[in-house]
């Protein structure tokens, strides 16, 4: 029996953990899946996608810098992809129409709620950043019914635009926006959705957003403690998590969308930590 073909598309892509994750899922579930990494030319993402599906490919994951292009390219979008304005998962429906989905938000919610036991319902949440990473996760976070969510960003107008967009769908939740300097804590949960940790930088917020019982979550991940999580630990936080679990959970949701089988994730996350 031949394996069904899947891949992750990005540029650059050599660093991607997705092939490793999906090969572990395939081993665990017994699904006949072959999963590779494809570096698409920056100027021809669409051609790369069409070539993949024209040659029998079954599904794609999409990473930077192509998530918005994937959303635009699709003929149909799931509701969560529509809200996210970006897609990290593509597949063909029964009519061979390209469908865009976004599993990032489900990924962070499952990691926080199920893997780390973080209560989201009724929580006071601070989300740092207003780019594509944050837009991709806000909908599923709000679906968990936190008491309030503050979106803080260097450019306040971008945070305000997100608050307006998601406020229409979640009118029962206090959703507000501000600049980094205007944040007033403390919070039950602080999520860093900026890429500052990758550059060794920090968002310009003060430590009063953190109490000892504040959960801090950096959507970036690394072998060492991320810059943001180290800052949080230095200012009294006890529970800090990086985004590796989110990466595995969003991959598991994509696997489920494609195959109808939901892989078990904790062993895969542990294996990646020790790779």
From Swiss-Prot:
Which pathway does UniProt place it in?
Metabolic intermediate biosynthesis; chorismate biosynthesis; chorismate from D-erythrose 4-phosphate and phosphoenolpyruvate: step 4/7
The active site consists of: 67
Q: Which Gene3D superfamilies match?
A: Leucine Dehydrogenase, chain A, domain 1, NAD(P)-binding Rossmann-like Domain
Instruction: Supply the enzyme class, top level.
Output: oxidoreductase
Cross-referenced CDD domains = NAD_bind_Shikimate_DH (cd01065)
Q: Which NCBIfam families match?
A: aroE, PRK00258.1-2
Q: Name one GO biological process term.
A: chorismate biosynthetic process
Assembly and partners? Homodimer.
Q: What is the lineage of its organism?
A: Bacteria, Pseudomonadati, Pseudomonadota, Gammaproteobacteria, Pseudomonadales
A molecular-function term among this protein's GO annotations = shikimate 3-dehydrogenase (NADP+) activity
Q: What is its EC number?
A: 1.1.1.25
Q: What does this protein do?
A: Involved in the biosynthesis of the chorismate, which leads to the biosynthesis of aromatic amino acids. Catalyzes the reversible NADPH linked reduction of 3-dehydroshikimate (DHSA) to yield shikimate (SA).
Q: Where does NADP(+) bind?
A: 129-133, 153-158, 219, 243
Q: Where does shikimate bind?
A: 16-18, 63, 88, 104, 221
The entry's keywords: Amino-acid biosynthesis, Aromatic amino acid biosynthesis, NADP, Oxidoreductase
Family recorded in the similarity comment: Belongs to the shikimate dehydrogenase family.
> What is the protein's given name?
Shikimate dehydrogenase (NADP(+))
Q: Which GO terms describe its cellular component?
A: cytosol
InterPro entries referenced in this protein's UniProt entry, alphabetically: Aminoacid_DH-like_N_sf, NAD(P)-bd_dom_sf, SDH_C, Shikimate_DH, Shikimate_DH-bd_N, Shikimate_DH_fam, Shikm_DH/Glu-tRNA_Rdtase
Write down the chemical reaction(s) this protein catalyses: shikimate + NADP(+) = 3-dehydroshikimate + NADPH + H(+)
